[in-house]
């Protein structure tokens, strides 16, 4: 009995260690408008009373990762047992979206990858296994001259745990799922060691583009032994193959990471509700930082907003 209790305790401790220091996207900012994400600390316990948000929901309250064993599971699409957000937010093609993470551990080096998948007729009722994702951003190794190097997520940390991604100007208007992901490689030197942290948001893209890029279903984005999944970061790195399909030809590369000034707080829309077109703009300022008087402060203490002390990081070209 003592042996069983000790084994159970060890398992519990290992599980706690696994999920203790990871993260999730707490909010997004589009053209200065702050939109709350899925709050893992409260929403799962609120049932139908949880606010309507564009973020996909997940019972993963421990902030834990997905493993390569999950790549063929629907969990890899938008995280563990994720269901579509009930709302959506509007964005103009060519605008930039700032995604705010909870503090990301500095040891978890790896790429930042973003995808879009078109939803028809909308994203709130979409079958996630039918979504076909095309890559619009992928930043891997930025500077490999020292070990373990400077990676995409190191730029995210430097930029107050935020990431800017640009919605391609050339895509056709309509409803899309934005799939944003960090892949931690600190244990990826052997098979099964990579850690994936996907988050999804429902968008309605406005514009006059016509492209409808072909995509890949989420369960076929990666393989456990694919390029960039098994990778030893504890060596001098001259190049790195960002996992996933080839970058969409219309994607904006080399987006300079910068904080987004918050000017107001927005609420996700639902299909059929009156909508307004977001103001034109890049959605980010390389020098402006949020001030305490610039916007209504979100009431949830768990929803982090970009810090005024975050400095813009250097530009990094998207890797293929």
From Swiss-Prot:
Keyword terms of this UniProt record: Carbohydrate metabolism, Cellulose degradation, Copper, Disulfide bond, Glycoprotein, Metal-binding, Monooxygenase, Oxidoreductase, Polysaccharide degradation, Secreted, Signal
GO molecular function: metal ion binding; monooxygenase activity
Record region (Disordered): 275-320
Biotechnology: Lignocellulose is the most abundant polymeric composite on Earth and is a recalcitrant but promising renewable substrate for industrial biotechnology applications. Together with cellobiose dehydrogenases (CDHs) an enzymatic system capable of oxidative cellulose cleavage is formed, which increases the efficiency of cellulases and put LPMOs at focus of biofuel research.
Catalytic reaction equation(s): [(1->4)-beta-D-glucosyl]n+m + reduced acceptor + O2 = 4-dehydro-beta-D-glucosyl-[(1->4)-beta-D-glucosyl]n-1 + [(1->4)-beta-D-glucosyl]m + acceptor + H2O
UniProt xrefs under PANTHER family: ENDO-BETA-1,4-GLUCANASE D, PUTATIVE (AFU_ORTHOLOGUE AFUA_1G12560)-RELATED
This protein's name: AA9 family lytic polysaccharide monooxygenase F
């Amino acid at each position: 009995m003592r042996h069983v209790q000790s084994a159970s305790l060890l398992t519990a401790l290992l599980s706690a260690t696994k999920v203790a220091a990871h993260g999730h996207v707490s909010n997004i900012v589009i053209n200065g408008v702050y939109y709350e994400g899925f709050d893992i600390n409260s929403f799962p316990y609120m049932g139908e009373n949880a606010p309507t948000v564009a973020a996909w929901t997940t019972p993963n309250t421990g902030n834990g990762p997905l493993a390569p064993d999950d790549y063929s599971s629907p969990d890899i699409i938008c995280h563990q047992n994720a269901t579509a957000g009930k709302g959506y937010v509007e964005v103009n093609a060519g605008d930039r979206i700032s995604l705010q993470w909870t503090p990301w551990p500095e040891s978890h080096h790896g790429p930042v990858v973003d995808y879009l998948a078109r939803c028809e007729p909308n994203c709130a009722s979409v079958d996630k296994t039918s979504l076909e994702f095309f890559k619009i951003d992928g930043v891997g190794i930025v500077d490999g001259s020292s070990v373990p190097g400077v990676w995409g997520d190191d730029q995210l940390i430097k930029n107050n745990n935020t990431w800017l991604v640009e919605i391609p100007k050339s895509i056709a208007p309509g409803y899309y799922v934005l799939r944003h992901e960090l892949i931690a490689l600190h244990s990826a030197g052997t098979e099964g060691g990579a850690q994936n942290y996907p988050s999804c948001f429902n968008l309605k893209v406005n514009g006059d583009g016509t492209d409808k890029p072909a995509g890949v279903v989420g369960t076929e984005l990666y393989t456990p032994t694919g390029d960039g999944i098994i990778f030893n970061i504890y060596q001098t790195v001259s190049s790195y193959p960002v996992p996933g399909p080839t970058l969409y030809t219309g994607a904006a590369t080399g987006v300079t990471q910068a904080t987004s000034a918050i000017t107001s707080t927005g609420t996700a829309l639902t299909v059929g509700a009156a909508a307004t077109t977001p103001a034109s703009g890049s959605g980010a300022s390389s020098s402006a930082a949020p001030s305490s008087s610039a916007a209504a402060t979100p009431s949830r203490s768990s929803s982090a907003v970009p810090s005024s002390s975050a400095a813009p990081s250097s530009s990094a070209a998207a890797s293929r």
